[in-house]
């Protein structure tokens, strides 16, 4: 195996493990909190918002630690190992007052690995525009494996999801040590607070096209999290069997569109491809909205919304990461990836999850319907 092939294989396994962890708990946490712990809708929204808090802490951690003191692969290893321990402690937290802060601690450890992993991959791949989507494709496979793994051993309402994710996180941490050495770029340099926080990347906002791109990403993130916060609760109330396995079709779609993304970027460019991604999100919510009316087409509409995931995610977020990498010069590339992570998984996620939880709480029914629905979908 050539050195290039070996690198791609290691990065692919890294992406697989990283998203296996996420997939093993993120979708199923909603039913777990609603059914097992009896949390209210607003509390469920806040719990999903913990990921956003982690994303807002992430640029500081990456800017302060990764760029100045330690190699990226070592930070990934430490965060993976610590994150695994925290995940295994989460099932002990059965009240919101204990669960919420523990989840924030975990997210503060996990979210930085997303930007660090992307930055490390883009640094070492010789042709990022072609190779990065192929490597990143294994993240979708990892998410599917996480969902199927949980579905095979337990239900979505079970705390087992956190033990599964915790074990995977420990493996992820150990495997990270096999990644190519990526030393800090600013060792011994005097670094300003602005550089630590990644504020240098804000210079990109002077370009109108980049500013519009960031605004669109922020706005689309708000409704995006209605899907992640509410879908699991919605399908649980509809009494969907094998819910985790069925929702994993979203990641099957993800794999397909990962493979198609290089063609679309060559044929249409970033602007049109990203617009297609936004249009697919609109179509997805129309499908889910009409599915709430019930009827013979309900299942078809829900599956349509699930299968649109690949185009929704890859044409918008993966294309967006590649666009940012192309727009930023080498000096601020890491900060630029941190900026987009802050927008996508930070501010946008926090606003989206908060609103999604409030809307879920507002539409809770005083008494479940004859069909067992606890919310007015």
Language model segments and positions:
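Structural signature of the two symmetry-related core transmembrane helices
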Residues: 74-88, 272-287
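C-terminal membrane-cytosol helix-exit motif in multi-pass small-molecule transporters
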Residues: 154, 166-186
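A membrane-interface helix-boundary motif in multi-pass transporters
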Residues: 152-168, 358-377
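Cytoplasmic helix-loop-helix junction between adjacent transmembrane helices
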Residues: 104-138
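Helix-to-loop junctions at the C-terminal end of transmembrane segments
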Residues: 57-71, 153-154, 256-270, 360-361
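Helix-loop boundary and gating motifs at the non-cytosolic
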Residues: 2-52, 209-248
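Conserved MFS/SLC helix-loop-helix module at the cytosolic interface between two early adjacent transmembrane helices
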Residues: 57-94
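Juxtamembrane intracellular "pre-TM" segments in multi-pass secondary transporters
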Residues: 1-5, 179-216
């Amino acid at each position: 195996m050539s050195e290039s092939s070996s690198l791609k294989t290691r990065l692919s396994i890294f992406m697989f493990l990283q998203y296996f962890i996420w997939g093993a708990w993120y979708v199923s946490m909603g039913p777990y909190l609603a059914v097992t712990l009896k949390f209210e809708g607003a509390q469920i929204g806040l719990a999903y918002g913990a990921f956003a808090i982690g994303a807002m802490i992430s640029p500081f951690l990456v800017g302060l630690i990764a760029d100045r003191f330690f190699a990226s692969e070592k930070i990934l290893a430490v965060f993976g190992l610590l994150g695994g321990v925290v995940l295994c402690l989460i099932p002990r937290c059965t009240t919101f007052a204990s669960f919420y802060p523990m989840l924030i601690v975990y997210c503060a450890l996990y979210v930085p690995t997303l930007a660090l992993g992307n930055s490390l991959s883009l640094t070492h791949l010789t042709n990022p525009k072609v190779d990065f989507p192929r490597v990143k494709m294994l993240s979708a496979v990892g998410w599917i494996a996480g969902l199927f793994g949980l579905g095979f051993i337990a239900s979505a309402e079970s705390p087992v999801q956190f033990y599964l994710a915790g074990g995977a996180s420990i493996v992820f941490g150990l495997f990270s040590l096999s990644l190519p050495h990526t030393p800090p770029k600013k060792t011994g340099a005097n670094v300003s607070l602005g550089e630590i926080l990644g504020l240098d990347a804000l210079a990109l906002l002077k370009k109108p096209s980049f500013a519009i791109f960031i605004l669109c990403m922020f706005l689309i993130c708000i409704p995006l999290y209605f899907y992640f916060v509410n879908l699991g609760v919605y399908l649980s109330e509809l009494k969907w069997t094998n819910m985790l396995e069925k929702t994993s079709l979203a990641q099957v779609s993800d794999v397909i569109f990962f493979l198609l993304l290089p063609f679309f970027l060559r044929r249409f460019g970033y602007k049109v491809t990203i617009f297609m991604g936004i249009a697919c999100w609109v179509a997805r919510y129309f499908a889910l909205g009409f599915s709430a009316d019930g009827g013979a087409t309900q299942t078809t509409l829900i599956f349509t919304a699930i299968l649109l995931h690949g185009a929704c995610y890859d044409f918008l977020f993966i294309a967006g990461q590649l666009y940012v990498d192309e727009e930023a010069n080498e000096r601020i590339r890491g900060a630029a990836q941190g900026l987009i992570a802050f927008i996508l998984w930070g501010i946008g996620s926090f606003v989206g999850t908060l609103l999604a939880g409030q809307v879920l709480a507002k539409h809770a029914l005083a008494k479940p319907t004859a069909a067992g629905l606890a919310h007015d979908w």
